C-alpha cells in the first residue's frame, strides 16, 4: 500500500499515514503471543483505509481485524485485539497510553462530578500515593477482547450520551477497593485495599454489574437482587410498582411475588364489584419494569411468582408465549411457578389438584410456605367445602401444561417452596421464604408493603460476588478469597443508599450476602472430571463444603469484630442448624463423600459470636462477569469452545480457558447425554449453599424419537430435581441448531442477551 494517504489525527491535524508506526503498534500487541500473524492483521486493515481517515478509525479498524481472526486454532488473537483495544481506550480516556497519577485522576473526576466526593475526603494525598503504588496497569493486558468490550460497554465510567470514557480498568478496581474499605481503621485499611485490589484485578473474585459500574460514583445502590412481595390490595400493588421503578432505575433486577392477588371474578367490597384478576396488574408491573433502562447500563427485568394452585394458573402459564393477543399476554416478564410436595404427590397418584383464589381460603397461602403439614390439612378441608369457589384439574394435565410452556418459552421457572423453607438459612416460623428473585438463586424473607414508606413491610436485598474456581490451586485458597468477599460485601450494606425505607431496614438487620462461583466448567476440565459420568461428584462436594465453611468462618470472625446482624435470632444458624444438617438426605445415595473440615469447632464459634450475615452463598448466572474474567459462565458447561456474543461493535468471540491444553477434557453442553449428571452436581452444591442455585435444564431434540422431547422426560427431570432437594430451576434451554449453522465452527456458542444479562441478579 502506498504511503500517499493522509490521516486526520485526534487533534484535527492532517499528516501522511505512517505505516511503520502501525506496524510497531501491532508488533507490541503481538509480543509473547502464539500463532499470531502481524502481516495478516495489517493486510486486513489496509484494504479498509481511505484518504483522510481518522486515526481513531484506523485504530478501530486494526482492532476489528485482529478480533475477526480469533478462532480455535488461533485463540491468542483475543489478547492481541484486547491490547489494541486497551491502547485505544486509554487514548480516549487520558489522551495518551500511560495512565495519570491516581490522586490527580481522582481529583479531576471529583471536580467533574463523576466520582463520589467522599473519595477525596476519606483519604489523604499520602494514602493515594500508597494506593498508586499498588496499581499494576500491566494487568490490563490480561483481558481478553470480549472482556475489554464488556468493560467499555458496561463498567468503565463514561458519558453515555457522548461516549466519552473517563477511566481505565485498574483505576476502576483500586477505587472500588478504596470505597469499600474506607470505614476501616487507618492502620489496617491499606492492607485490605491492597489484598482486595489484587484479588479482583487478577479475576480471583468477580463482582456484579451494580458494583463494577457504580461504586466510586455518586450513585450508591449496589444490591444486585431485589425481592418485592405484593399483598392483595390496591395500596400494596401501587407501592410494589413504585418500589419496582425506584430499583430498576438503579441497576437492580426484580423478583415480584404476586401470588396473593385474588383471581378473576372474586368479589370486591362484599360483591359491590368483581375483581379483574391478575393479568391487568401484571401488565402494570411490566410497565414499571420497562420504564427505566437502569442507568443506561442494562434494561429492566423481573420474574413474577405465583402458586401452582392459583385459580388463574391456566391463564397465567401462557402469558409468555407467542400465541394469543395483547390483551391476554404479558410477554416482557418472566414467571416462576411455586410447587410443593403435595402437588407432586397428586400427580404421581393420578389425582386432581384443586385451584383456589387465595382470597377465598384463609391461611392457605401462608401455610403453603411456612408449614407443610398445616397446608395439607386445610387444603383438603377447603377442597371439601362446597361453599368455596374452586376448580379441579388433573394434576398430570396441569404439570404437562407447566412443562409445555417451560419448554416453549424457556422462561417458566420452578420454585420448590417446601425445600426453600426446610433447607433454609432462616427459621421458617420467624422468617418465611415466599419467593425468589429474577434469576432464581436468592431465597430471602419478604413482607408486603402497603405504601412506599411502610416500615412494617420488607423488601429483601442481596449483594453478590463470585469466586473464580478456575484460579484456585488449593481449597485453602478459598479462605482468603472468602474473607475478602464477605468483608467487602458487608461494607457495601453501610456504604450504599436505599431508595425505599423497608429495604434499608431489611438489608441492615439481615445483612444477606450471596457469594457464588464462576469458571466451574474450567475447574472440572483442569481436574479431568466431567458433568455427566459422576466423576465430578466428590470434587464438587469437597469444593462446596470448603466454600461454605470459609464463608461462614469469615462471617463469624466479622461478627466477633463488629457484632452479629440484629436479626441473627431469626436464622437457623442461631439454632445451631446448618445446611449440612437440613439437606435432602437423598443426596447421600448419589455421593458418599464425607465432610473434611472442622464443623464442630465452627459451630461452637458461631454459637459464641454469631454471624455478621444471615446468608452467605447463592449460585448465580454470570454471563457478563465471566467474560471479564475470561472464565466459563457460573456452574454451566460451555456450549462451545468459542462463545460469540452480539454487541454494537459486532460479534465478540471468546475462547474457553486453556483451550489447547484442555480441549479433550472440557465437556460441552450438547455432548452431555441428559440432565441427570448436572442435576446431581447441583444437588450436591445445594447441600452446602444456604440460598439457592440458578440451575438450568437442557434438551437436544435430536436425541429423541422424531426429534420431539417426550413429556415424560420433562416430568422425570422435574421429579429428579425435587427428589434431590433442588430448590429452584431457572432456564430450560432447547438446542435449536442456531449455533450449528454458524459459519465459524461446530463448537461455537452463540450467546444472546437475555433477562439475566439485562437484569441484575447476575454478576
UniProtKB/Swiss-Prot annotation:
InterPro entries: ATP-cone_dom (IPR005144), NrdE_NrdA_C (IPR013346), RNR_lg_C (IPR000788), RNR_lsu_N (IPR013509), RNR_R1-su_N (IPR008926), Rrm1 (IPR039718). GDP binds at residues 209, 437, 441, 623-625. The active site is at 437 (proton acceptor), 439 (cysteine radical intermediate), 441 (proton acceptor). Keywords: Allosteric enzyme, ATP-binding, Deoxyribonucleotide synthesis, Disulfide bond, Nucleotide-binding, Oxidoreductase. Its EC number is 1.17.4.1. DTTP binds at residues 232-234, 262, 269. Transmembrane segments: none annotated. ATP binds at residues 9, 15-21, 55, 91. The record marks 756, 761 as: Interacts with thioredoxin/glutaredoxin. It catalyses: a 2'-deoxyribonucleoside 5'-diphosphate + [thioredoxin]-disulfide + H2O = a ribonucleoside 5'-diphosphate + [thioredoxin]-dithiol. Gene3D superfamilies: 1.10.1650.20, 3.20.70.20. The record marks 730-731 as: Important for electron transfer. The record marks 225, 462 as: Important for hydrogen atom transfer. PANTHER family: RIBONUCLEOSIDE-DIPHOSPHATE REDUCTASE LARGE CHAIN, RIBONUCLEOSIDE-DIPHOSPHATE REDUCTASE LARGE SUBUNIT. Belongs to the ribonucleoside diphosphate reductase large chain family. This is Ribonucleoside-diphosphate reductase subunit alpha. It comes from Buchnera aphidicola subsp. Schizaphis graminum (strain Sg). The gene is nrdA.
